[in-house]
Structures are given as structure tokens and as C-alpha cells.
Amino acid sequence: KRMNRILEVNESSHYAVVEAGTSQGMLDAYLRKHHPQLKHSLPDAPPAATIAGNIAIHGSGHLSQSEGGFHSEMVTGLEVVLPTGELVKLGSCSTVPAWFSRAPLPDLAGLFLGWNGTTGVITKVGIKLFPRPKYHDVLVYMTEDIDLAPMVLDRVIGTSMAEDINYALAPKPDYLRGFQMTVVNFTANTEEELAFKRKTLRSVMKDLYETRDSGFMPVPPNMKAGFLEAPQKALSKFADVRKGGGFEYVGAIMPIERIPDACRAGMEITARHGITYSLGARIIGRGNAAMFFFAYPFNRVDMDEVERVKKALEETNETALALGGIPWKTEVQGQQAILRQMEPGTYALMKRIRAVLDPEGIMNPGNWEVA
């Protein structure tokens, strides 16, 4: 926790170097105060969540659609302590005194990203920064047909004008019941540019909303403020919909075309277990993937409901794999479900890498291991 210094911000090459305990909120506040023209991609997580922790789990955020994918793909360099106690640097910082890139060197950073702490301990991170435009707006497109999702999302992505694209459906609040919502955030440096982007984003939906089966929702100022937040707080507010403060979810990385099937599966699972839901996705890359969430709130004092949610979560992990997705940030049970479906040669390679880096087997035993 004491390793929380922001060591460098390079305004020209757009990167920051931070210690592993630096939180998302700390970096965001520091940039707003000292480098207001720059920002980093913020996950929908509490401000205390760390930069290093989020990149290590392949996290994503409000710039993942427009600026390069998962946060692990925004890493420009790492400093890591190996299980043997050796300190190593990875990326350009290993060769020259700057943290600007992982290329063109052999990319060893992947040995410590997604491994659940089984290969080493990250102590410093180089992370990409991005310009902070002056203007920010949002459009909300409503549909009644889940199968329209891939088409709607593809059209928005195709404009190359959205900063963040999110899709959601839930039985609460009441205005969402029976509808699906695509939230499109976009930015600009001038009012003219903002107006042009707004017009273009609306135009690509014209043939759809002229049928009156879908359309743009008017967004009043109080609602717009929430949509413009980064990180988004809507899910944390949804956590208390059962008035008990309990909330768990399964995230799954999957192809965009599987979103309709994932929505149906989530509704079927919750109906079987007698619980409620919020379902949705954030687009990663320019349409390369989606981080789909199956979110289940519950009353923590209702132990029967707690057990039903646990069973629903277990079923959801298996369902995500069956849909062609991969459970994200999963616990040991979910990891084992992934490994059962993984190519044997891939898992054998993972074991060999761990044996080389951690010959004594001391780093997070139980993670990424077959039961």
C-alpha cells in the first residue's frame, strides 16, 4: 500500500510510470491537477482499485473501445520481482531510461498479465495516457429486439466516433423493462466537432428508427450527468436494488455476435434460480470483443437468496464457456472450468513457464491449476 507514488508523467510520449499501489483515483486526480490535457482509461471500479491490479487481470475501462483494448494492452512497461527474488524490467525501460513501449523487444510482459500472481509480483507499471478533449456528450439508443444488438453496435463502431460503447438491459428501473439500451459516449475538441459526431452517429441508425421499432431516447440533464461519469456508478447503485447490499457478477470476454444469446442465457438462469439481474456489455477494441457482465444483486441477510445466487454464478461460468466466451477475473473454480476446455498443449506450456519462474511453487498455489 505504501508503494503508491506517481513516478513520471511524460506529456510528449503520453505515458505515466506508477508504483504498484497507485490507485485509479490517485492517478486521475493527479492528471486533472497537473496534466489536465491527459487522461487514462478508468475501469468501472472504486477509486481505490489499483492500476497494477487492473492491468494484471486484463481489466477494461471507458477508453477500451476507442484507445486500444484491454488495460493490459495499454501497458508500456513493467518492473517485476520474480519468485526467486530477482528484480527485472520489461519493455523499453529494460534497455533505455524511458517507459514508452514494449516493442520492438521480445514481449515478456505477458508472463505477468492474466496469471493471477503465479509468476511474480509487479512493482511498477508504465501505462498509456490519452488526450482529454474539451467536450463530452452521450446518445442513448433503445431497442425492443435483443437480436438487433450486433447490428446497432457494429454501426456505432463503424463511425470511429465513439469513445465508449455500452449495452445493457435490466427489469429495473421500470423504464428499462422490455428494452435494451446502447449508450454511446463521444468527445470533441470543439462544439462544431461535437455536433458533427452527434449528427453522424444518429444518421447511421436512420433506417432503423424510422421503422419506430427502435430509436434514440431523450436524455434529461440529471440522467445525462450519470451517463457522462467515468467510472460509471450505475452498477454500484444497482447493487442495492434488493435492499441488502449484496452484489456479484460474472464477467465474460466474448465475440460481439454472442451478446443476444448471452442476454437470453442470463435471463433464463435468473428465472430458474428466482433472482433478478442486470445484463450488458462494454465493447473492447474497435469491435474486437465485448466484456459481457451477468450481474446478480441479492439481500445479504437472506441466506436462501445468497445460496441461489451462488448456484447461478456457477452455472453462469459454465454457460459463458458454452456460448464461446471466456470467464474473466474468475475464482479458482472458474479457472478450472476454463482449463478443462483449454487445449492440452496450451496448459502444458503454462505449467512449464511456471516451473521455470517459480521452481518452488510458492506463488499463489491453486491458481491456474487443475483440481
What are these regions (language model features)?
Residues K329-A371:
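Activity-critical C-terminal alpha-helical subdomain
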Residues Y15-T22, P43, P47, S66, ...:
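Catalytic cores of large soluble enzymes that bind and process phosphate-bearing ligands
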Residues Y141-E315, L323, T330-G334:
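C-terminal substrate-recognition/cap domain of FAD-linked oxidoreductases
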Residues K39-S41, L87-K89, A162-N166, Y209-G215, ...:
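Acidic/polar loop patches that form or flank catalytic/metal-binding clefts of enzymes
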Residues K1-M3:
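Glycine-rich N-terminal segment of FAD-binding domains in flavoprotein oxidoreductases
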Residues R5-V9, E19-V156:
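FAD-binding subdomain of flavoenzyme oxidoreductases
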